[in-house]
Amino acid sequence: MIMKKLKMTTAIVAVALIGSVALSDGYGPFPVTLNGYSGDRTNTVSYSGQIARHVLEQSLKKLAGKGNGGGNAAALEAQMLSYFNGSDEDLPIIAPKSKDGFKIKQTSLHQISKGKNISGKFYGGAMPAWPGNMSGKEVAYNMISMAAKANKGFDAETGYDWAQLISKYTMGAMAYNQAVDNYLDEKLSGEKKPNNKPYKDGVHYTGKEHSWDEAFGYWGAAAHQHGFDPNKVYEIAKMKNQGAADKNGDGMVDLKSEYVFGPTYYAAAFDRSGTKSTDYTNTIYNAFLDGRKLITAAAGDALSDSE
């Protein structure tokens, strides 16, 4: 019992020191805690794969509105599938894309991460809410096919806006599902991806550090948005405030750390509208930040289920 209390006290002190000195600017950098690591890496934060998938989703949404009513359906569906299933080629980023007053650093997917797709991280269970007795992934393929045949992504008969349906569905079936039902569920158990071992061979971060980071990546926040009000977060997502987005002042917005994607964008949109009585944006961001500080404070020791 004494040792357990001592360990908890040490963790609390470490969190206080980390929070006041090294991590005051937001989510990272976080130091290497993996015991036995002898390389030159100093920051353990890594979630570029999740950012790549957000970009794939945004590009897919943009493509969903490019149909001309059937004439380009086959070619458009093939292009949309390359963003859903992934491609060996370095796909151009269709969205988000630079515009006047808001310059994006990356122009192609491999500049963020290679070998990523949406389909491999998509909910695969039954989806009875959609006609046809389909799985979750089959519904996505059906939506893509219908969007490719539509005129500008709109089905006049049903009123379906395929771009919106595909985007919202993907946010739930990929980003939310992966974060909540994978990285913050099974992979937070004491035995799965333990904190006293690397996430996989050859990396410099622990199993728990990376599991937490990947969940944060699916949340879609800018790493430096700590303390931002919802309006500022919303403006970054809408590409209307480069000054707030450009943390390092290089004149560009780095999609890997300075941009705001889907789930965080919608949290900010709710917080800034209506009665303004919610604070989803900062509550969730701060929970991720505090959790990462606690994992870092464990200093590479194993964490139990209760911890």
How would you name each of these model-derived features?
Residues 2-23:
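Gram-negative bacterial Sec-dependent N-terminal signal peptides
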